[in-house]
Amino acid sequence: MNGERLLACIKQCIMQHFQPMVYDESRCVIETTRGTFPVPDNYKKYKTLAFAFVGHVLNTDDTPVIEKELDWPDPALVYNTIVDRIINHPELSQFISVAFISQLKATIGEGLDINVKGTLNRRGKGIRRPKGVFFRYMESPFVNTKVTAFFSYLRDYNKIASEYHNNTKFILTFSCQAYWASGPNFSALKNVIRCSIIHEYISKFVEREQDKGHIGDQELPPEEDPSRELNNVQHEVNSLTEQDAEADEGLWGEIDSLCEKWQSEAEDQTEAEIIADRIIGNSQRMANLKIRRTKFKSVLYHILKELIQSQGTVKVYRGSSFSHDSIKISLHYEEQHITAVWVYLTVKFEEHWKPVDVEVEFRCKFKERKVDG
């Protein structure tokens, strides 16, 4: 980490979300876009802490204009909050030392009462551990090592608790292109995301019209369990294409062509609706569409399990939802301390809808419990 990034992380711990404000020394007030706040005497030598507290108020009070008189805590409480954020910041943990904290106190908290305990979020009850840890890895030299380390800790509550101080919420964001810099996996993921989105669009239009007119009295085959493993992903895709071509080569060929190109959301919806009109009312085509949709979901979930290094022990929990360029998938882990997992796969583009990356956002929640041993 260079000096500029280190300073940015420390500033983030002082004020988690930037708020424009000015300290008027002539009037001893802090002016903001949402109000003016008189600074009490015990904060006049701790301007950084005064800014941090006002920033905390602005972030936690939704009132457009704050007119009430603030209940300013002891400055040491604000200082404790900043230290707590720094200690638990994922990018700063390696820099924390006695000398670092001593220098921090000499800079922004010299002379504070060391007997004051707690933070702004929990006064008088000891240092509060933040309930969220956020990671973002987008550069090739770091992604694979960092992401692999995170997933190796994920299933072991003792490791997570000791490494991340009993946090219960994690958001890991990383570049798939950097994670899978070589090999077929990255390309396969981009392609199956596109195929899944197109089939979701078409199915949405078909189901909407089916609900209106109760079309398709013939029972369709039940949807396959998308979480089962596929031994050979490429074989599944190839056999799928051959099977559908036998039913209606022209129609499925058009869908395949649409899957091969990225374009605007409006263009996708227009073409998907036109194709859906040719499927509605034809029970065989509707059945084949459902098979295709299920197969692409299976391929997607198979690749996703490889991506999060969880083959065979993770199940799709509440299905998935989609937008024009992203898919959200809910997962269920067998470990009891992992209570909820959502994975967001978002395609990133250059000009002319050229896909260049898939940004992965892995969100999980834990159930806090005692550490073994």
UniProtKB/Swiss-Prot annotation:
Residues 349-373 are annotated as: Nuclear localization. Changing residue 78 to K: Abolishes interaction with REP2, but not with STB. Changing residue 330 to Y: Abolishes interaction with STB, but not with REP2. The keyword Protease does not apply. Changing residue 50 to D: Abolishes interaction with REP2, but not with STB. One of its GO terms (biological process) is protein localization. This is Partitioning protein REP1. The gene is REP1.
